[in-house]
Amino acid sequence: MEPSALSPSGATLPLPLSLAPPPLPLPAAAVVHVSFPEVTSALLESLNQQRLQGQLCDVSIRVQGREFRAHRAVLAASSPYFHDQVLLKGMTSISLPSVMDPGAFETVLASAYTGRLSMAAADIVNFLTVGSVLQMWHIVDKCTELLREGRSAATTTTVTTAAAPSVSVPCASVPSGNGGTVAPATVGSVRSHTSSRASENQSPSSSNYFSPRESTDFSSTSQDAFVASAAGSGNRRDGGPVFPAPVVGSAGTTSGKLLLEADELCDDGGDGRGAVAPGAGLRRSNCMPASAVPQKHWVYVKQARNCPAPASLVHQDPDLEDEEEEEDLVLTCEDDEDEEMGGGSGVPAGGEPEATLSISDVRTLTEPADKGEEQVNFCESSNDFGPYEGGGAGAGLDDPGGPTPSSYALTHPPRPLLPLDVPGNQILVFPSSSSQAPGQPPGNTAEHGAVTLGGTSAVGLGIPSGSGGAPGGTGNSDGNKIFLCHCGKAFSHKSMRDRHVNMHLNLRPFDCPVCNKKFKMKHHLTEHMKTHTGLKPYECSVCAKKFMWRDSFMRHRGHCERRHRMGVGGVGSGPGPGPGPGTPSGPALQPKRESSTVGGGSGDEANSATPPSHRRVWSPPSVHKVEMDFSGGGGAAH
């Protein structure tokens, strides 16, 4: 008999091996996925510990005399600038420009390992500079957003989001820099940030291929939340608006600092704004760059203290304008959101001048009317704005018969500005309203747009006729300029912004491997390499002469072809010293030619003595003359 599987006491006995069910075989094509989500953070944490202990570090970075050790693989993965330095050039020691703050760089270097960045509100500009040099655009975008939010929060008391519900973050009051307290703030729910940079396909050598991780859900925990609170005082008599004192949503941790993820936690639009308490906040640094000033409105920067007041802006001769060095007026751009209409100018109420000339003193041409100041007209050329002015060339802001600026600023379209970009191309603008009655003075707010001005030929402005259009049409391309530099200029492509940043910092990242000459642009290095290879790819079809540079070849080809045509077309049919056939005649322009000592001359010689009309040179009879023979012979002197 088979032994019972149960013991007399009822306990289960182990089955014999032969009776155990066999394991189910896995299909041959099956793939088993195993995820270890904690490995990524643990790996970076381990690398950061190695960096802090100086272990396995293979690259050193010097900033203003201080040296930092790091891992080249981490640097190349986190910064396009370091990618070019350590991967393409194989450098083991990198010296960064002295414009960077060593403390800010140390924090940014740690954020490459930890994914977190902690900064004081007054040091945001330093971090913006470091991010611009290292081309870490997620830091540049975040610092720009914080500066923009701080500026807008200083001009409003409470801004609530209209598209999403708000989430209240309770926190204790934090003392501000001027003795006030910051009330608990409200943070709007933030959409995950989707950037168009992630879809760009660029070569690693262009320093523009890098794009940070884009979408990350906003965490409401105390470690991932931050609230920007601002002061309500609008007085800027001692250096500009106050910057908000940040509040971190955890009691007793990182008071007075901003704790933010290196990934994009918030979208650039800033859906939510914090409720503010009057008198709170830290003052914004006077050296803040123009990145804090968003785009698309002309603004007026006032003069420094003790500077002579500028004369009224009237139309002057261009030569005289160059000599007016004491006016020191600067035009920049400002975002069309957070703007209020009214009158404004560069003279404070009460006549007290500003202490410093900084970006914190920027005032738009359309400031609130309570400033009690006059508007300033920056564009005095009536020729530029004729299509929009029905009052003729003399119509302007100073027209005594027209309405005051405060009366028409809210009801009339803006006055267009016609600035020039860096290459000298004209940037067209259009008014915010599609029509304007003749004789009415325009407003002062200008919006950029690649459209054809009304009444102006598109051909005369150097743009295709099909590129123009009404506001909002296909011709408006300024909306695509989403890549901002910290100077305030916007670009439609990230590669253009990278080249612009290199120009700012005078960086020359491309050096010749033969002679070590450095260049700002990669195509400059490519052209320079021709001097070492001796390659001359351009050959003249007339004289078979070869050229290395295309512009030299094009200049030579034009002259060579003209000489060839003159030599072939100027052959005469008979001997004689007279001019050959086809030679222009005229007593005023006909050069004199003395008769040859030889009995006769060919038609070639006769024609060669008289160049074409656009090359003819007049010689008085008493001057020794030289005949030029373009058919291949030498010149004969008489």
UniProtKB/Swiss-Prot annotation:
Keywords: DNA-binding, Metal-binding, Nucleus, Phosphoprotein, Repeat, Transcription, Transcription regulation, Zinc, Zinc-finger. GO terms for molecular function: sequence-specific double-stranded DNA binding; zinc ion binding. Its main location: nucleus. It holds the Pfam family BTB. A zinc finger (C2H2-type) spans 483-504, 510-532, 538-559. Belongs to the krueppel C2H2-type zinc-finger protein family. This is Zinc finger and BTB domain-containing protein 22. It comes from Mus musculus.
